[in-house]
Amino acid sequence: MGKEGVTIRSARQEDLEAIVEIYNEAILKTVATFDTEPKTCDEQTVWFATHDAKNPLLVAELTGIVVGWASLSKWSDRCAYSDTAELSLYVRGDHQGKGIGRRLIEAVLDEGKKNGLHTILARITEGNDGSLHLHQSVGFTHIGTMREVGKKFGRRLDVHLLQKLYPTH
Protein backbone atom coordinates (compact mmCIF):
# COMPACT_ATOMS: atom_id res chain seq x y z
CA MET A 1 0.00 0.00 0.00
CA GLY A 2 1.62 3.40 0.27
CA LYS A 3 1.50 6.20 2.75
CA GLU A 4 -1.96 6.53 4.34
CA GLY A 5 -3.22 3.45 2.50
CA VAL A 6 -3.02 5.07 -0.95
CA THR A 7 -1.45 3.11 -3.79
CA ILE A 8 -0.19 4.88 -6.91
CA ARG A 9 -0.09 2.62 -9.96
CA SER A 10 -0.44 2.57 -13.73
CA ALA A 11 -4.02 2.84 -14.90
CA ARG A 12 -5.70 -0.25 -16.31
CA GLN A 13 -8.63 -0.46 -18.72
CA GLU A 14 -10.95 -1.37 -15.86
CA ASP A 15 -10.09 1.99 -14.20
CA LEU A 16 -11.55 3.99 -17.10
CA GLU A 17 -15.02 4.27 -15.57
CA ALA A 18 -13.63 5.75 -12.33
CA ILE A 19 -11.28 8.05 -14.27
CA VAL A 20 -14.19 9.37 -16.32
CA GLU A 21 -16.34 9.78 -13.19
CA ILE A 22 -13.62 11.89 -11.52
CA TYR A 23 -13.16 13.96 -14.66
CA ASN A 24 -16.91 14.50 -15.03
CA GLU A 25 -17.07 15.78 -11.44
CA ALA A 26 -14.45 18.38 -12.41
CA ILE A 27 -16.36 19.27 -15.59
CA LEU A 28 -19.61 19.87 -13.74
CA LYS A 29 -18.34 21.51 -10.54
CA THR A 30 -15.01 23.25 -11.21
CA VAL A 31 -13.06 25.38 -13.65
CA ALA A 32 -10.14 22.92 -13.58
CA THR A 33 -11.12 21.85 -17.11
CA PHE A 34 -12.73 23.85 -19.88
CA ASP A 35 -14.77 20.87 -21.02
CA THR A 36 -18.39 21.73 -20.27
CA GLU A 37 -20.23 18.50 -21.09
CA PRO A 38 -19.67 15.20 -19.24
CA LYS A 39 -17.72 12.51 -21.10
CA THR A 40 -18.58 8.86 -21.62
CA CYS A 41 -16.22 5.93 -21.31
CA ASP A 42 -16.59 5.34 -25.05
CA GLU A 43 -15.50 8.92 -25.77
CA GLN A 44 -12.47 8.59 -23.50
CA THR A 45 -11.27 5.22 -24.81
CA VAL A 46 -9.11 6.79 -27.54
CA TRP A 47 -7.60 9.26 -25.03
CA PHE A 48 -6.88 6.36 -22.65
CA ALA A 49 -5.09 4.44 -25.41
CA THR A 50 -2.72 7.37 -26.14
CA HIS A 51 -0.95 6.82 -22.83
CA ASP A 52 2.15 4.68 -22.66
CA ALA A 53 5.47 4.57 -20.79
CA LYS A 54 6.57 7.97 -22.10
CA ASN A 55 3.14 9.54 -21.55
CA PRO A 56 1.89 7.68 -18.48
CA LEU A 57 -1.54 7.61 -16.89
CA LEU A 58 -1.46 6.81 -13.17
CA VAL A 59 -4.23 6.36 -10.63
CA ALA A 60 -4.40 6.73 -6.86
CA GLU A 61 -6.27 3.86 -5.27
CA LEU A 62 -7.61 3.81 -1.71
CA THR A 63 -9.14 0.60 -0.36
CA GLY A 64 -9.68 -0.63 -3.90
CA ILE A 65 -11.32 2.57 -5.14
CA VAL A 66 -9.72 4.96 -7.65
CA VAL A 67 -9.81 8.41 -6.02
CA GLY A 68 -7.57 10.36 -8.40
CA TRP A 69 -5.50 10.26 -11.55
CA ALA A 70 -2.63 12.05 -13.25
CA SER A 71 -1.43 11.85 -16.83
CA LEU A 72 1.24 13.16 -19.13
CA SER A 73 -0.20 13.66 -22.61
CA LYS A 74 1.52 14.65 -25.83
CA TRP A 75 1.67 18.43 -26.08
CA SER A 76 1.53 18.34 -29.88
CA ASP A 77 1.66 15.85 -32.73
CA ARG A 78 4.49 17.84 -34.35
CA CYS A 79 7.76 15.90 -34.15
CA ALA A 80 9.81 18.70 -32.58
CA TYR A 81 7.58 18.49 -29.48
CA SER A 82 8.19 14.77 -28.94
CA ASP A 83 9.89 15.33 -25.55
CA THR A 84 7.19 17.71 -24.26
CA ALA A 85 4.04 16.66 -22.41
CA GLU A 86 1.13 18.28 -20.62
CA LEU A 87 0.31 17.28 -17.06
CA SER A 88 -3.29 16.68 -16.03
CA LEU A 89 -4.30 15.98 -12.42
CA TYR A 90 -7.73 15.26 -10.97
CA VAL A 91 -8.66 14.07 -7.48
CA ARG A 92 -12.18 13.34 -6.28
CA GLY A 93 -13.56 16.32 -4.39
CA ASP A 94 -13.99 14.36 -1.16
CA HIS A 95 -10.32 13.30 -1.25
CA GLN A 96 -8.68 16.64 -2.02
CA GLY A 97 -6.31 18.20 0.51
CA LYS A 98 -5.01 14.83 1.72
CA GLY A 99 -1.72 14.73 -0.21
CA ILE A 100 -3.04 12.44 -2.95
CA GLY A 101 -2.52 15.04 -5.69
CA ARG A 102 1.09 15.58 -4.61
CA ARG A 103 1.80 11.86 -4.65
CA LEU A 104 0.25 11.51 -8.10
CA ILE A 105 2.20 14.46 -9.53
CA GLU A 106 5.50 13.26 -8.09
CA ALA A 107 4.94 9.74 -9.43
CA VAL A 108 3.87 10.80 -12.93
CA LEU A 109 6.76 13.28 -13.18
CA ASP A 110 9.22 10.54 -12.16
CA GLU A 111 7.82 8.28 -14.88
CA GLY A 112 8.05 11.02 -17.50
CA LYS A 113 11.65 11.82 -16.59
CA LYS A 114 12.64 8.16 -16.55
CA ASN A 115 11.15 7.72 -20.03
CA GLY A 116 12.87 10.62 -21.75
CA LEU A 117 10.62 13.65 -21.44
CA HIS A 118 12.35 17.03 -21.18
CA THR A 119 9.58 19.60 -20.72
CA ILE A 120 6.32 19.29 -18.80
CA LEU A 121 3.64 21.95 -19.17
CA ALA A 122 0.55 22.57 -17.07
CA ARG A 123 -2.40 24.88 -17.63
CA ILE A 124 -4.12 26.03 -14.45
CA THR A 125 -7.24 28.16 -14.43
CA GLU A 126 -7.35 31.33 -12.35
CA GLY A 127 -8.79 30.76 -8.92
CA ASN A 128 -7.41 27.22 -8.67
CA ASP A 129 -4.83 28.42 -6.14
CA GLY A 130 -4.35 25.02 -4.51
CA SER A 131 -3.31 23.48 -7.82
CA LEU A 132 -1.10 26.45 -8.66
CA HIS A 133 0.75 26.18 -5.34
CA LEU A 134 1.02 22.40 -5.62
CA HIS A 135 2.61 22.60 -9.07
CA GLN A 136 5.03 25.32 -7.96
CA SER A 137 6.00 23.25 -4.89
CA VAL A 138 7.16 20.39 -7.15
CA GLY A 139 9.31 22.61 -9.35
CA PHE A 140 6.99 24.18 -11.91
CA THR A 141 7.64 27.79 -12.90
CA HIS A 142 4.93 30.23 -13.94
CA ILE A 143 5.82 31.28 -17.51
CA GLY A 144 2.77 33.27 -18.50
CA THR A 145 -0.91 33.98 -18.26
CA MET A 146 -3.34 33.66 -21.13
CA ARG A 147 -6.01 36.29 -20.46
CA GLU A 148 -9.70 35.47 -20.73
CA VAL A 149 -9.16 32.44 -22.96
CA GLY A 150 -12.06 30.44 -21.56
CA LYS A 151 -15.61 30.96 -20.44
CA LYS A 152 -17.25 28.68 -17.92
CA PHE A 153 -20.12 29.16 -15.48
CA GLY A 154 -20.77 32.55 -17.09
CA ARG A 155 -17.29 33.94 -16.38
CA ARG A 156 -14.32 34.70 -18.62
CA LEU A 157 -11.26 33.03 -17.15
CA ASP A 158 -7.49 33.41 -17.37
CA VAL A 159 -5.24 30.36 -17.61
CA HIS A 160 -1.77 30.23 -16.10
CA LEU A 161 0.89 28.33 -18.04
CA LEU A 162 3.50 26.54 -15.94
CA GLN A 163 6.59 24.63 -17.02
CA LYS A 164 9.01 22.15 -15.51
CA LEU A 165 12.27 21.31 -17.29
CA TYR A 166 14.29 18.19 -16.66
CA PRO A 167 18.05 18.71 -16.87
CA THR A 168 19.65 17.64 -20.14
CA HIS A 169 22.44 15.14 -19.76
What are these regions (language model features)?
Residues 112-124:
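Conserved GNAT acetyl-CoA-binding A-motif
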Residues 16, 20-47:
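Conserved GNAT-fold acetyl-CoA-binding loop/helix
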Residues 7-19:
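A short beta-loop-alpha structural element at the N-terminal edge
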Residues 97-110, 133-137:
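Conserved acetyl-CoA-binding loop-helix of GNAT-fold acetyltransferases
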Residues 87, 120-122, 162:
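A structural signal for short, well-ordered beta-strand segments
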Residues 38-94, 105-106, 111, 165-167:
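Acetyl-CoA-dependent GNAT
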Residues 71-74, 121-124, 136, 141-158:
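Conserved catalytic-core motifs of GNAT/GCN5-like acyltransferases
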